[in-house]
């Protein structure tokens, strides 16, 4: 599981560690998800982690919280099992959320949200 990777210290970036701890604590359904490499431009570490199975809208708010605090940048897209999310961080400089991304997220939540039980 993703939390095992974090506990083993395989993810070296501080922002990714914070992201991992927060996601596991707030109940994301995590799909095995992290491939990382040190062989990227400028030699910085890079990790892209995918989570899916949005259980309730409050988890999306957690995703925004992570972005606001510079932990990661969310990208939501429609997948076969609903809404998938991708967070990534290059070194300690994380990409900020854009207006276009917010519009995309709101559209997806509107079109896919009925598939999720927000009361649980």
UniProtKB/Swiss-Prot annotation:
Protein name: Putative uncharacterized protein YJR018W
Residues spanning the membrane: 93-109
Domain of life (superkingdom): Eukaryota
Protein keywords: Membrane, Transmembrane, Transmembrane helix
Membrane topology: Single-pass membrane protein
Source organism phylogeny: Eukaryota, Fungi, Dikarya, Ascomycota, Saccharomycotina
One GO cellular component, as annotated: membrane
Localization: Membrane
